[in-house]
Design a protein with these regions (language model features):
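Bacterial Sec-dependent N-terminal signal peptides
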Residues: 1-23
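Zymogen propeptides
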Residues: 21-257
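Conserved, well-ordered active-site substructure
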Residues: 118-147, 151, 155, 294-366, ...
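Loop/turn positions that initiate beta-strands
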Residues: 272-279
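Short, solvent-exposed loop/linker segments at the N-terminal edge
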Residues: 426-432
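Beta-strand-rich structural segments
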Residues: 432-446
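Low-complexity "stalk/linker" and mucin-like segments enriched in Ser/Thr/Pro/Ala/Gly
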Residues: 458-474
Length: 480
């Protein structure tokens, strides 16, 4: 069976031409913006490629637009190797987490800044890939923030996005039948009078509380009770496992936790006995609003707020330099998510400073936006079309610490249930021929065929005719 597309070519080619080429101001400079690619690639998701031409430079830009109201699309972060340390390419993260018929990670970008070298406190375990600041994936806190200049993108389980104007506030608690104590962080270095919670994602699966002062730290293991799961903002009942110890760099049990502290925190930990029940709560708040985020990544600076470019370049030294950049943001109604990469350090694309990146995000439809890790990390991946941008390391993807992904939760289906154009809209002159590129999609809107052949096109005879091959239009009509 052949599928048919009826081409209202005069309407499509003329109206879409205004969409394909416009003028847009990028930090006081006018650029001609040409759409070089635009197509649906998955449930509620399109990918768009742009060429911006200015007075003395060009820029290549690639972005995803995701309809968060689509029932078959989800947004998820991945911490590389599913551990606090470890690096993978964006492609590797997507492929390793995809489960056919359950969750296909069909598009994504790199995430926040991460350690590119170094070892843990033991001096031997690598920390390469460890996020510099907060990271949450599948509701699990991999790390909390350690810097006031961090800004965060988070999204809830019901797909409501948030972007902080300041560092996400984190103050957890551990409560016994008679007492409670503040938890100051997760998987970060301990401090005097503070309790830190360590998870089994730690490098070496130990607390890494070592060094000259480590004999002063008290530690004890905890395990969630049956049916309990520790996620941001939801109290979790746990049981103390074993006796507390001092200065042991304690091993963290699979699926469990260890709390560590010294000074005033020491007596609290010493009061815990094997079998005691405790409750742990780890709330996070964005600009004062407590949010139960399911996924979170970190960047800086925040570049767009309420649709306005923010004067935040002073927050990081390289913000005023031209580099490849990655950004994430969302529309004013929070129903559209934008994930964007601008290439840089190439002959065809200079790269941008963060104020320019903000204007690119405005063009793409964002009202709020955050600068993520860029440079050689900048990557925009799709499962069917590959990496869409040109990573600055000669096109080779860098292994990074985390990524943000668009996930199809639709059932698996390899049957082509619909077709659509994948050729950038443009104008053709009378007498010219035009053969559009056509993509095939399953019933859930997932791109499954980029080489469709079993289709024919038709058109109104007043604008031209279709050749015998059924796929080539000739513009020889008088118009509508």
């Amino acid at each position: 069976m052949k599928l048919k597309i009826y081409l209202w070519l005069v309407l499509w080619l003329t109206v879409c031409n205004s969409y394909a080429s416009v003028t847009w101001k990028v930090w006081n400079t006018d650029y001609r913006v040409d759409t070089t690619f635009h197509a649906k690639i998955g449930p509620g998701t399109t990918q768009t490629s742009l060429l911006l031409t200015g007075p003395d430079t060009t820029l290549t830009v690639f972005y995803l637009t995701v309809d968060l109201t689509d029932p078959y699309v989800d947004i998820r972060t991945v911490c590389a190797t599913d551990h606090l340390a470890g690096a993978q390419t964006v492609t590797q993260m997507a492929e390793s987490h995809s489960v056919e018929g359950e969750s296909l990670y069909f598009a994504g970008i790199n995430g926040g800044f991460f350690a590119m070298s170094g070892t843990a406190n033991d001096g031997k375990t690598s920390i390469v890939g460890r996020p510099h600041h907060a990271s949450v994936a599948e509701g699990e806190i991999y790390r909390t923030s350690t810097s006031a200049i961090c800004r965060h993108f988070g999204i809830t389980s019901d797909k409501v996005p948030y972007l902080s104007s300041a560092s996400v506030d984190f103050t957890g608690t551990i409560t016994t039948a008679t007492d409670s104590y503040e938890i100051s962080g997760v998987n970060v270095n301990a401090g005097n009078n503070k309790i830190i919670l360590y998870t089994d994602k730690m490098p070496g699966q130990v607390t890494q509380v070592t060094g000259s002062s480590f004999p002063m730290y008290y530690e004890v293991a905890l395990m969630p009770k049956a049916g309990e799961r520790l996620v941001p903002g939801k109290p979790c009942k746990m049981t103390v496992k074993g006796a507390w110890a001092r200065g042991t760099n304690m091993a963290i049990p699979d699926g469990g936790y260890v709390i560590s502290g010294k000074g005033l925190a020491g007596p609290f930990i010493q009061s815990l006995n094997d079998g005691d029940e405790v409750e742990v709560n780890l709330p996070m708040s964005f600009d004062g609003e407590t949010v139960m985020v399911e996924h979170l990544t970190t960047g800086n600076p925040k570049i767009l707020g309420n649709g306005e470019v923010l004067n935040t370049e002073g927050e990081r030294a390289d913000a005023i330099e031209w580099h490849p950049r990655t950004s994430i943001g969302y529309s004013k109604d929070k129903k559209k998510l934008i994930m964007l990469v601008c290439d840089g350090r190439t002959e065809i694309s200079r790269g941008v400073r963060t104020r320019e990146l903000a204007d690119l995000m405005r063009y793409a439809g964002a009202d709020e936006a955050l600068n993520l890790d860029g440079g050689g990390s900048s990557t925009l991946y799709t499962s069917m079309l590959g990496v869409r941008n040109y990573p600055s390391s000669k096109g080779v993807q860098r292994k990074v610490g985390d990524g943000v992904f668009v996930v199809s939760t639709a059932p698996a289906s390899s049957f082509v249930g619909g077709i659509d154009f994948a050729t950038p809209p443009h104008v053709i002159s009378k007498g010219e021929e035009y053969s559009p590129t056509v993509y095939g999609y399953n019933a859930y809107g997932l791109l499954i065929n980029t080489e469709m052949s079993n289709y024919t096109i038709t058109c109104d005879e007043r604008i031209g005719y279709v050749k015998a091959d059924g796929k080539t239009f000739v513009a020889d009509g008088i118009g509508l």
